[in-house]
């Protein structure tokens, strides 16, 4: 299979390596790379979008200008929300390439661990089962297990929404709040993800799988996670600017928190953890006050959402 990977960051190069290891022909495009976008797209049978969310719309415009032949599979591996529409990256691709098969790839996939040869699993989801199956076969190996799903909305939203909860988990660890508090935070974070995800058309059960709970557990517990690193630094009293300056790559949860909080307010959608993390990121509330605000919310019966 001839594959074009858009984005030369850690995740893009990792996916390129996984596909190349299965004897597929892979070309990678990045803004600083040697290959032009047209060269990378030429004769591609699948295009993997591994771009930072902020770059997606602009690159789509470039791909439109160059043209993409019918039948080319578009694979979205970006985990973020668009500032203008408050929609995930796949929605941008779908709007401009409605006649192309769309596949979403998401799961508990820390690029550094995969590059080190450690085992991992992921999900490729699509309304087009044949397209999902082709991408599954393209990437699967003895160290990278790939599942398919028809719930592409739920699979993508799990990866997007968990970034905000990972920041919260990092704050909790930075403050030294202990295992009890972190367990409560992750559990209620999952409930918040399900509430938002089902509002946007995902299936609740999808969030208990690899792309939801699996990705959530990984990013909330690993210092390799950029979103966790942001939260941990804030919990230690560092400024957001200082944390981001040291960060390698993009912590999508920072932008996602602000976009989601604004959307939720307009839509009367309850997102208490996101609201508090947004306040901390914006310097409106110190982490200890955000914790107190969560702990003193109205008492209620536990539910899954």
From Swiss-Prot:
One of its GO terms (biological process) is glycerol-3-phosphate metabolic process. Catalyzes the reduction of the glycolytic intermediate dihydroxyacetone phosphate (DHAP) to sn-glycerol 3-phosphate (G3P), the key precursor for phospholipid synthesis. NADPH binds at residues 11, 31, 79, 111, 226, 252. The active site is at 162 (proton acceptor). Sn-glycerol 3-phosphate binds at residues 79, 107, 162, 215, 225-227. One of its GO terms (molecular function) is glycerol-3-phosphate dehydrogenase [NAD(P)+] activity. Belongs to the NAD-dependent glycerol-3-phosphate dehydrogenase family. One of its GO terms (cellular component) is cytosol. This is Glycerol-3-phosphate dehydrogenase [NAD(P)+]. It catalyses: sn-glycerol 3-phosphate + NAD(+) = dihydroxyacetone phosphate + NADH + H(+); sn-glycerol 3-phosphate + NADP(+) = dihydroxyacetone phosphate + NADPH + H(+). Its EC number is 1.1.1.94. It comes from the Bacteria. Pfam families: NAD_Gly3P_dh_C, NAD_Gly3P_dh_N. InterPro entries: 6-PGluconate_DH-like_C_sf, 6PGD_dom2, G3P_DH_NAD-dep, G3P_DH_NAD-dep_C, G3P_DH_NAD-dep_N, NAD(P)-bd_dom_sf. Pathway: Membrane lipid metabolism; glycerophospholipid metabolism. It comes from Gloeobacter violaceus (strain ATCC 29082 / PCC 7421).
């Amino acid at each position: 299979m001839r594959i074009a990977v858009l984005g030369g960051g850690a995740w893009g190069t990792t996916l390129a390596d996984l596909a190349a290891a299965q004897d597929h022909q892979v070309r990678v495009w990045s803004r600083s790379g040697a290959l032009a976008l047209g060269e990378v797209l030429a004769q591609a049978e699948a295009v993997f979008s591994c771009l930072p969310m902020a770059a997606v719309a602009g690159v789509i415009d470039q791909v439109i200008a160059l043209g993409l032949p019918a039948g080319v599979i578009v694979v979205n591996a970006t985990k973020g929300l668009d500032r203008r529409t408050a929609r995930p990256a796949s929605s941008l691709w779908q709007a401009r390439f409605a006649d192309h098969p769309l596949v979403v790839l998401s799961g508990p996939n820390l690029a550094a661990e995969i590059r080190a040869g450690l085992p991992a699993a992921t999900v490729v989801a699509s309304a087009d089962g044949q397209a999902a199956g082709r991408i599954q076969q393209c990437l699967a190996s003895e160290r990278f297990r790939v599942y398919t799903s028809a719930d592409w909305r739920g699979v993508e939203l799990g990866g997007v929404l968990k970034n905000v909860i990972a920041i919260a988990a990092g704050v909790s660890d930075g403050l030294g709040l202990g295992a009890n508090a972190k367990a409560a935070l992750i559990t209620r974070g999952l409930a918040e993800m399900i509430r938002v995800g089902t509002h946007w058309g995902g299936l609740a059960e999808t969030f208990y799988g690899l792309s939801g709970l699996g990705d959530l557990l990984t990013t909330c517990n690993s210092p390799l996670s950029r979103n966790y690193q942001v939260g941990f630094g804030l919990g230690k009293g560092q400024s957001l600017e200082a944390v981001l300056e040291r960060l390698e790559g993009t912590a999508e949860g920072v932008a996602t928190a602000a976009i989601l909080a604004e959307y939720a307010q307009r839509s009367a959608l309850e997102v208490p953890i996101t609201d508090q993390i947004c306040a901390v990121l914006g310097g409106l509330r110190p982490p200890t006050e955000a914790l107190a605000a969560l702990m003193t919310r109205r008492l209620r019966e536990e539910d899954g959402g």
